[in-house]
Amino acid sequence: MSAIAQKWLLRAAPWFLPVGIVLFWQLASSTGWLSSRILPSPEGVVEAFWSLSASGELWQHLAISSWRAVIGFSIGGSIGLTLGLISGLSRWGERLLDTSVQMLRNVPHLALIPLVILWFGIDESAKIFLVALGTLFPMYINTWHGIRNIDRGLVEMARSYGLSGFALFIHVILPGALPSIMVGVRFALGLMWLTLIVAETISANSGIGYLAMNAREFLQTDVVVVAIILYALLGKLADVSAQWLERSWLRWNPAYTAQEAKA
């Protein structure tokens, strides 16, 4: 096999399983083995997608969900990054913050929904708050972990060359912690959509989650499947975006350089 063919095969490999599942799904539906009352056929899902797209309803819900996700991630990610930096750079910061953050991290989002509705109602603030809360913790943990696992030899070497304070942070500590921070970004982006699903299915009047719950009330399983697939694709898009940022910001890192060479 030529190098070019092998390269294209490796790029297509992640899609073999999804395509195989869809083909099996279509075969089971067309032969009657899988009832449409249980799961609509892929053809029916595509028809529902085109119908929602043509009416513009799908894009309205998608735009609203995307806006909530981006705003919530921006707020929660920024707070998590800031708290992680404080806790990672300062022993006193860790003593003050870490225990409280870890306790809050273990509280399920579903348990907070009654309080969130009481505090914010069912407007946008409630959904954004839940998304921000969900994305805060992975950013905090990975930022703290990245700073605490920096090679101390590099820090001492930088200090011997006269770096200290902000210069030491910018040139040594932040670049050293960045790989772990980017892992936090990828994890937070995944939790962003998971949290939004919870928020939109319980306390919303718009968005992809609301579309799915509304379709469930009328037994429109094809629309429910469209919403599920959309969430999966949005999650994949967020992960691909995070990978692109990793490649762009970590070109200096030998591990990422080796990955690009293999790709």
Residue ranges and their predicted role:
Residues 1-29:
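N-terminal signal-anchor/first transmembrane alpha helix
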Residues 91, 148, 179, 183, ...:
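C-terminal transmembrane helix and the adjacent membrane-cytosol boundary/short C-terminal tail
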Residues 102-138, 145-146:
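Generic hydrophobic transmembrane alpha-helix motif, especially the helices
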Residues 129, 133, 166-198, 222-225, ...:
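Transmembrane alpha-helices
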Residues 71-101:
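Transmembrane-helix boundary motif in ABC transporter permease subunits
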Residues 3-4, 30-75:
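Periplasmic/extracellular loop-to-transmembrane helix junction in inner-membrane transport proteins
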Residues 99, 142, 146-184, 212:
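Short cytoplasmic-facing helical segments at TM-TM junctions of multi-pass membrane proteins
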Residues 117-118, 147, 194-231, 250-260:
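Glycine-rich helix-loop "coupling/hinge" segments at transmembrane-helix boundaries
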